[in-house]
């Protein structure tokens, strides 16, 4: 157990030491799903085809279906994401004592390792807390010196950060243009300060084939939650047995599995963007399921999760005024719970409140 501090708040990493033997990933041998397997709530969007006012208006309709959508044909070489996955898998195969050297709750600032079951999302799963059944490595990007086990690890992670930051900026710019089709008084420059590569970090994640221990109360690999971010980008690779672990929950409580589509990026609208648009855009409620007891073998999955944080100074747009029936009331519940209103706040305050209750 490691006890350290983040912004003066004591945090405990009570992770579980585990031995791993992860084989390298080969993209051509993975059980990808076709785009036709996507449910209607999760559209696949090519941003190169979103240009005209009509296309922007349809894009806005599509991203409001669930707050989650795929970006395809984005131009990021698949070798970058696969290289990231394999560098982390190689790291995880080291003894826990060697990995532990990179374990620190400063990971959100300058990278670092989080052991299996080392975190728990405060406020997720209706405040029923459980540990996350995942091992992670956070990466802040080339603007800082990250903790890294070797140069190859750093090169792949820096390049993934650069490419996904460029894609995120294109996505954000398109979203802001699309908002103007519904709210003519809104101007994209109003929220342009949220486009800042220094606001992004990502985590490399593996969900091992690990069921709960006997007597352990755990309903999910990762409990249902909404990200605090402006937007979140996610690349995911499939489980060998075809199990679809990632899911979203719709407004009526329906659970919809999210199939992994080859070399594509999921976009989750975050609570930050929902807050700044006065809950017009819905933050996606999502989590990761366990397989059933007969389906654990081959259920390991992995993902690269890039959090694009909002600008520190946060003021909801005065020119985005949705009708009552257009508002997603529960879309930024963490912001509501910590007492953030239309008068604005700083993201540092929101983040501090989050970290205060994040780690078990």
Swiss-Prot record:
Practical use: Escherichia coli cells expressing Digenea simplex kabC are successfully converting supplied synthetic prekainic acid into kainic acid, thus providing a less expensive method to produce this molecule for neuro-pharmacological applications.
Pathway(s): Secondary metabolite biosynthesis
Cofactor(s) recorded in Swiss-Prot or TrEMBL: Fe(2+)
Catalytic activity: prekainate + 2-oxoglutarate + O2 = kainate + succinate + CO2 + H2O; prekainate + 2-oxoglutarate + O2 + H(+) = kainate lactone + succinate + CO2 + H2O
E.C. designation(s): 1.14.11.-
Control of this protein's activity: Inhibited by the iron chelator EDTA.
SUPFAM superfamilies xref list: Clavaminate synthase-like (SSF51197)
Residues engaged in binding Fe cation: 225, 227, 286
GO molecular function, one term: dioxygenase activity
Gene3D superfamilies reported for this sequence: B-lactam Antibiotic, Isopenicillin N Synthase, Chain
Alphabetized UniProt keyword annotations: Dioxygenase, Iron, Metal-binding, Oxidoreductase
Domain of life (superkingdom): Eukaryota
General function of this protein: Iron/ascorbate-dependent oxidoreductase: part of the gene cluster that mediates the biosynthesis of kainic acid (KA) and derivatives, natural products with neurochemical activity acting as ionotropic glutamate receptor (iGluR) agonists, thus being neurotoxins. Catalyzes the conversion of prekainic acid to kainic acid and kainic acid lactone.
Protein's name in the database: Alpha-ketoglutarate dependent kainoid synthase
